[in-house]
């Protein structure tokens, strides 16, 4: 099937690098390979930048003054820091960086395998692999794939919970030290009130970014991790209802991409508020008092993703009108 690049920057060109993954839109196996290879690139970036920051880290100088990008996140998770947020051991950072580099190699190899050795279309593999072949207008199969993604995200949320509660704890800026979170908040009224901006019976424009204690942070991750895993199981077993498909049509890849970009934009905007105003999640010891530059970057990325949503949503309507 020919891939149309009409109304894109790749229109009227035969340059494969400019057309990008649009060439693979109907090749489920090769698109999976590109997906895995992309994850490998992200892992490689994380690992290489972490190692680079370890090599140039200067003890006694705050991380934010050294323009660190990833080490503050690791320090926030309680790795290598002691009282007052002082870095007492950079070896955990080095190990984490190496693990990411190893993971990037594995993912890169997996991506190359699916591109060059595996069938271009998963259905042709047969067996269990064929179960993951999809058509863009098959909501049941897309629900199967979505479900597995949600379960993985849920496990990711619980990794933070395990680190905070059982494996060394995380950094608490309010006591300026690392501690175990032994009593996370389970009360649904407390946790879900943040979604509508209710904090201590008062409304705040900050919404969930108004959280000011790690018990609520970890309790929220327990809730969201559970919801993600249960939601993943639901989507694996139950196809989207007809009324859902009317609100969020599932007809082509452009629609799926537009929904993903809209979710990404939402996460970026929420992250920007957290970065700018929340010292509990972004301790000033590691990120500094003034984080306007970091927050602005998050806003710009969110706006870019939102523009992408409108672009691909329009592309989807164009494709649907051509089909009709």
Curated annotation (Swiss-Prot):
One annotated GO biological process: photosynthetic electron transport chain
GO cellular component terms attached to this protein's record: photosystem I; photosystem II; plasma membrane-derived thylakoid membrane
InterPro entries for this protein: PS_antenna-like (IPR000932), PS_II_antenna-like_sf (IPR036001)
Keywords: Chlorophyll, Chromophore, Membrane, Photosynthesis, Photosystem I, Photosystem II, Stress response, Thylakoid, Transmembrane, Transmembrane helix
Membrane topology, from the record: Multi-pass membrane protein
Positions of transmembrane segments: 31-51, 68-88, 93-113, 222-242, 256-276, 292-312
Cofactor note as given: Chlorophyll a.
Pfam families, sorted: PSII
Subcellular location: Cellular thylakoid membrane
Cofactor names: chlorophyll a; chlorophyll b
SS bond partners: none
GO molecular function, one term: chlorophyll binding
Major location category of this protein: membrane
Induction, as annotated: By iron stress.
Assembly description: The antenna complex consists of chlorophylls (a and b) and chlorophyll a/b binding proteins.
Function: The antenna complex functions as a light receptor, it captures and delivers excitation energy to photosystems II and I. The pcb genes are not related to higher plant LHCs.
Family according to the record: Belongs to the PsbB/PsbC family. IsiA/Pcb subfamily.
Name listed for the protein in its UniProt record: Chlorophyll a/b light-harvesting protein Pcb
């Amino acid at each position: 099937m020919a891939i149309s690049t009409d109304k894109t920057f790749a229109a009227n060109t035969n340059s494969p690098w400019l057309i990008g993954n649009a060439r693979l839109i109907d090749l489920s196996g090769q698109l999976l390979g590109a997906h895995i290879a992309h994850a490998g690139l992200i892992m490689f970036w994380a690992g290489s930048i972490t190692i680079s920051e370890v090599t140039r880290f200067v003890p006694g100088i705050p991380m934010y003054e050294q323009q660190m990008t990833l080490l503050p996140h690791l320090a926030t998770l309680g790795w290598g820091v002691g009282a007052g947020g002082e870095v007492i051991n950079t070896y955990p950072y080095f190990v984490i960086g190496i693990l990411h580099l190893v993971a990037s190699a594995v993912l890169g190899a997996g991506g190359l395998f699916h591109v060059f050795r595996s069938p271009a279309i998963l259905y042709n593999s047969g067996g269990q692999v064929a179960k993951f072949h999809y058509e863009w207008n098959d909501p049941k199969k897309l629900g199967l794939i979505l479900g597995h993604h949600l379960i993985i995200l849920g496990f990711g949320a619980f990794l933070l919970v395990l680190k905070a509660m059982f494996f060394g704890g995380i950094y608490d800026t309010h006591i300026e030290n690392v501690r175990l979170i032994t009593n996370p908040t389970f009360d649904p009224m407390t946790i879900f009130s943040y979604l509508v901006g209710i904090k201590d019976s008062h409304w705040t424009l900050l919404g969930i970014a108004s959280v000011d204690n790690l018990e609520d942070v970890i309790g929220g991750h327990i809730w969201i991790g559970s919801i993600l895993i249960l939601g993943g199981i639901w989507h694996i077993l139950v196809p989207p209802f007809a009324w859902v498909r009317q609100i969020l049509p599932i007809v082509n890849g452009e629609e799926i991409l537009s929904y993903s970009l809209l979710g990404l934009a939402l996460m970026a905007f929420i992250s920007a508020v957290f970065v700018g105003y929340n010292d509990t999640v972004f301790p000033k010891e590691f990120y500094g008092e003034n984080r306007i530059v970091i927050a602005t970057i998050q806003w710009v990325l969110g706006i870019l993703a939102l523009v992408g949503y409108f672009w691909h949503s329009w592309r989807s309507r164009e494709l649907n009108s051509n089909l009709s």
